[in-house]
Regions:
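Mobile cap/lid helix-loop segments that border enzyme active or cofactor-binding sites
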Residues: 1-61, 89, 181-194
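Iron-sulfur (Fe-S) cluster-binding segments and ferredoxin-like electron-carrier domains
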Residues: 83-100
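Acidic/His metal-coordination segments adjacent to aromatic residues that form catalytic metal sites
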Residues: 101-112
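Acidic/histidine-rich alpha-helical segments that form the ligand environment
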Residues: 113-154
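Preference for long, well-ordered alpha-helical segments
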Residues: 146-191
Length: 194
């Protein structure tokens, strides 16, 4: 049960209605979280920003979706770990690839560029001490432009920070998520062991 209430039909504006409908079409962000966020003017601004960060920019959406899921499982957010972007699916992201996110370095499913982004997402989740190193950025520069690195960093920051907040809203508990996908507990244990 969410800790905040969803927006009521009588509270909708044309914009809040469109943001929720867009979430239903794209699959991410989930309409339930959009319904919570759109009860606040700054929440509406955040949903608009998140949609731009997620679906626009210079990085492929599929790459960002892989990083989002990797970080989400690391902080055991039931909601974030089970949400899937329809756009990323159309771009070729499969559940088999998602399973391989937790052994991305040894996977044949990912390019060197995708592995570099996933490594950065993994380090980002570990904390600022893990990414505040020249070598981290030298490794990224082999695969990404400065513009792409900025976008990747902003994206990981948003996923990590807002993901913690969304987890605390209890839209979907970790236990409920593990019922939907029993492999989540295994993946979370793998991430914790790293």
């Amino acid at each position: 049960m969410p800790r905040l209430r969803y927006i009521e039909e009588s509270e909708h504006t044309p914009l809040t209605r469109e943001l929720i409908e867009s979430a239903k079409r794209t699959g991410a962000p989930d309409p339930r979280v959009v319904s919570l966020m759109t009860r606040s003017l700054l929440g509406i601004a955040w949903v608009e920003y998140w949609n731009k960060l997620l679906y626009q920019g210079v990085l492929p959406h599929k790459l960002k979706e892989m990083c989002r899921i990797r970080i989400s499982v690391a902080h055991q957010c039931g909601y974030c770990s089970t949400v899937r972007s329809n756009v990323a699916k159309q771009e070729g992201l499969t559940e088999h690839m998602i399973e391989d996110l937790f052994d991305y370095a040894g996977s044949k499913h990912f390019t060197a560029r995708e592995k570099a982004a996933l490594r950065y997402a993994e380090l980002f989740k570990q904390g600022e001490h893990a990414i505040d190193k020249d070598q981290v950025y030298a490794d990224l520069a082999k695969h990404f432009s400065d513009e792409e690195i900025i976008e990747l960093g902003l994206f990981c920051a948003e996923v990590d920070g807002v993901g913690k907040f969304v987890k605390s809203l209890n839209v979907l508990s970790w236990e409920e998520a593990c019922e939907l996908n029993p492999k989540l507990n295994i993946r979370a244990a793998q991430v914790a062991a790293e």
